[in-house]
A protein has these predicted regions:
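C-terminal catalytic/motor cores of large multi-domain enzyme assemblies
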Residues: 1-270
Length: 270
């Protein structure tokens, strides 16, 4: 049957290149249901709560502070080795529409454990809403994607195989999910060593989380421990930060608002 040939757009070409780069990574998966009731209660109090991508990015990076293996990548050049990075680099999958075509682009958040949760969320939202030219990570990957195939292949080989560049280009872990589109179990692919995906939070306070990892770097025992640590961090450090944001919201509501051009007291108490 005769069809129509269509040109591959740059965002789609990026996915093609990513899948080629991911095909040699021996991924293994482990899924678990986490009880995050305390986190959900704290988040539910906020008028503008941070998204779950930001929450999981920061929580995983906090766990990785004391687990160097979660900041380790496998590299082939100049010889096969493990390369440990000093801090986490999260690659968050951003779903957006470019020229009428749905696409997914990775936003880099460097050291999310060192940033306020609101800042992590701001970086993710900026990547979703701003033009591609205004997002540094997008500009970087789009420049590589527009290269002719021989040069593009060389750039990918350098990024994949040199230890330092692998961390710079693909991060130490990725965060993705389809919770915003109804949820489901997502077995994603990435050249990076770890991929965390999450489902929709359930009314009973649980959420299904999957971690896929490069089996060359670690084994299932560590990942099983990571789930327990992740659950604890979500319900303690992250929940505490969310409650702090609620306190800030309440304080802002109680503060008087100055009316422009008003005389006398010039305030309206809210």
């Amino acid at each position: 049957m005769r069809g129509t040939s269509k040109k591959i757009s740059p965002p789609r070409r990026l996915i093609v290149d990513l899948m080629l780069a991911s095909r040699d990574v021996p991924f293994v998966s482990l899924a678990r249901s986490l009880n995050i009731r305390a986190l959900l209660e704290a988040r539910g109090l906020l008028a503008q709560p941070p998204g779950f991508a930001a929450i999981f990015a920061k929580a995983f990076a906090i766990v990785a502070r004391d687990e160097p293996t979660l900041r380790t990548v496998y590299a082939k050049w100049p010889w096969p080795c493990f390369y440990e990075l000093p801090r986490s680099m999260a690659m968050v999958a951003i779903a957006r529409v470019e020229d009428g075509e749905p696409c997914v682009l990775p936003q880099c958040v460097c050291g999310p454990d060192r940033l306020a949760l609101t800042e992590v969320d701001r970086l993710i939202r900026h990547a979703k809403e701003a033009p591609i030219a205004e997002v540094p990570m997008f500009r970087k990957i789009m420049r590589a994607t527009h290269l002719p195939w021989p040069l593009r292949r060389l750039a990918w080989r350098i990024g994949l195989n040199f230890a330092r560049q692998r961390g710079n280009w693909f991060g130490t872990f990725a965060v993705t999910g389809v919770a915003a589109y109804g949820g489901g179990e997502l077995q994603a692919l990435s050249p990076g060593p770890y991929i965390l995906s999450f489902d929709v939070a359930k009314p009973d306070g649980s959420i299904a989380v999957m971690i896929r990892w490069d089996h060359r770097v670690t084994d299932a025992a560590l990942i099983a421990r990571v789930f327990s640590q992740l659950e604890q961090v979500l319900n303690t450090e992250i929940a505490t930060e969310l409650r702090g944001l609620r306190a800030v919201e309440l304080k802002a509501l109680r503060e008087p608002v100055r009316v422009a051009g008003a005389r006398g007291s010039g305030h309206l108490g809210l």
